[in-house]
C-alpha cells in the first residue's frame, strides 16, 4: 500500500498492515460468507494457515493438495476437532476466497508445446510485500521470490497478461 512512500515509521506501518490484514481476512472473507448465507469459509484457523503458507511460498509452484498435506505434515493444523488432511476441495475454496479478495493473485502455468493452460502447479503472489513481511517477519532470505512478486505486479500494472511458460521440465 505504498507505506514507504508516505514516510511512516515502522511501528505505524505495522499497525496499518495489521489493519489491512484484519480487514481483508476477517471482514472481507469471513463476514462476507456469513452475509451471503454461505458456509464455505468456516474455519478461521485454516484460513490463516493457508494465508501464511501462500505468503511463505510466493513465486513457488504449488498444488492445492500440497497445501493441505504440508500443513498437516508440519503439524500446523494440530487440533482435537480436526481429523486428517483438509480435502483439496476445501483448500481450493479457501484459496479462491483469498483470490476473490485480491489478497493473493494466481498465475497459471502454460504448456508451450501443448498450447494450453495446465490445471496444476500455478504460482501465487501476495498483493503487497509489506503484508508478507508483516505476516512472516522481516527477513532477508528468499529475496528472489520477493523480487519475482514485485516484477509480476509491475507487469500487471503495465497491462501485460502474465503466465508461466513450461517446456518439458524447464520454466
Where are these regions (language model features)?
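Amphipathic alpha-helical segments of the small helical/lid subdomains adjacent to P-loop NTPase cores
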Residues: 1-2
